Amino acid sequence: FFQAEDGIRDTSVTGVQTCALPIYSQMHPKKGLRHSPISGVVLTNGDVDHVAGLLTLRERQNLSVYAHSRVHSVLKENSIFNVLNSDYVDRREMKMNVEFELKNKEGKGSGIFVEAFEVPGKIALWLEDESKGANFGTQEGDTIGLKISSASNEKSFYYIPACAKMTSELSEKLKDSELVLFDGTLWKNDEMASSKVGEKTGQRMGHMNNSGPDGSIEAFKDLNVKKKIFIHINTTNPILLSDSSERKIVEENNWEVSYDGMEITI
């Protein structure tokens, strides 16, 4: 979340490494060369593409970082994250299934409320330990989703950038919701191998595929979600191509494909 000109009330749901780039006018410095309007960050897992951008948010600007205790412990154990000077950066633990208001370093409320919850997934790639069996040492809190609401609770949406499967508990949570931003990593489970860019399947990486009977398109069919948008999309995924047959299938099933700078109103 970041400081808009008329208050701390805006959210960006891109990866932290993207948030740190000056691609949106709202994120440009407002008070000098080193000012950052970014007031805080919420982490949903410890993967590199979710935490690496923290290293660019270290220019002695006040910041609050929210995460599960599991992810905070990972950051604490890796000394490179000590560049986040504790004089300026508050590391705040998120309790699961408890709604709270996002606040800046000084404790000023943002008017944005978040409820974090666990979703099926796995440990961050760089923390995997093959000696610990099929789950590679996955622990509680390694993968979470967020429900993000306005202060009045009149509007809310879900942000789930990684999800290994749709459970009955998760489908019940998402049912009849206004907006869901969901893991769109791969079209097919074996996409990395068939594209000759890697060997791991989507399931091995902790991601549902979009297509097929066990895919996210099928999983959402009866959930009556008003607006569904794929995020966290791998470069191999053909839904990125506006003229592909896969994109056509996505759109026929009332899904949208996210893009840089996308703005959504609910």
Name what the model sees in each region.
Residues 37-49, 68-144, 151, 255-260, 264:
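Metallo-beta-lactamase
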Residues 141-143, 151-156, 164-262:
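Cap/insert and terminal regions of metallo-dependent hydrolase folds
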Residues 12, 16, 46, 119-123, ...:
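Active-site metal-binding loops of divalent metal-dependent hydrolases
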Residues 63-72, 181-183, 230-231:
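Short internal beta-strands
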Residues 51-58, 216-217:
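Histidine-anchored nucleotide/phosphate-binding helix
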Residues 1-19:
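Single conserved hydrophobic/aromatic residue that forms the stacking wall/gate
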Residues 39-40, 60-64, 156-157, 227:
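Short active-site oxyanion
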